[in-house]
Amino acid sequence: MAPVQAPMPPAMQPNPAMAVSIRGLFKRFGNKVAVNGLSLDIPTGSFYGLVGPNGAGKTTTITMLTGLLVPDGGVAMILGHNVWQDVNAAKRLIGLMPQPEQIFPTLTGMQLVVYAGMLRGMPRAEAAARAKDLIAAFDLTAAANIMVRDYSAGMTKKICLATAMIHSPRILVLDEPFESVDPVSSANIKDILVDYVHTGGTVVISSHVMALVERMCTHVAVVNQGQVVAAGTVAQVAAGEDLEERFLQLVGGRHGAAHIAWLDGGADGQPAPAVPQTPAGEVRR
């Protein structure tokens, strides 16, 4: 059952024109406030990055806006549908990539994706046809009939993403989709996500990799201590600086490094010898 709340003033109402509109989202676990009145608008057709330090509230926010966790306060709206008043309609519009530990490892890749489609109410034949297309797109055809437990980390992330896309959602929500993924698999995933956005879809990712967010995303929100401290286009949030440097300024994450007396690299306090320079055109052997 959705939490009972007092009516919001007009200025705090979510924006139904947005792909995702969050107002005053709040969640507490015991004495710890995980999400503290968080508000955010994610435009339709954007590639939106959520960044923040560990424990900032990103994953808790994602879990609430996708209908898997009941908030203690606030509201989340998906393309005009209130997540907790119309949860089934909201979930139909969302593709949430499961974490590797949340899938059935003894199913083959093909079985897993077909199963995900059938859970969404698709006939088996349609789910199988779509699964074949997705597996080919993710370059997993040779592994389609291998159990997922025997997949590499990159292959597992790709098959998890395929299960999120099987029902052709309007919004993809991905928590750390590139974590532990090799460069080849990462490039494959990026290409598919960018193509999806070009068709009008919306992608929301959480990530710790600032360079990836700066390169891929159109928009970014910096989350710290359960609140959004900056949001907008990547250029607006970066404000003329490197995004990682701006992030550190916003969350107060840079601290002076303590000198470790015994960690001297073997130079006994002497400057390191200069690295010999190779003359232009000469190949060092």
Each model region followed by its residue ranges:
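Helical segment within the ABC ATPase nucleotide-binding domain
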Residues: A187-T199
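A short, surface-exposed alpha-helical micro-motif characterized by mixed small hydrophobic
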Residues: V213-R215
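ABC ATPase "signature
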Residues: A231-G232
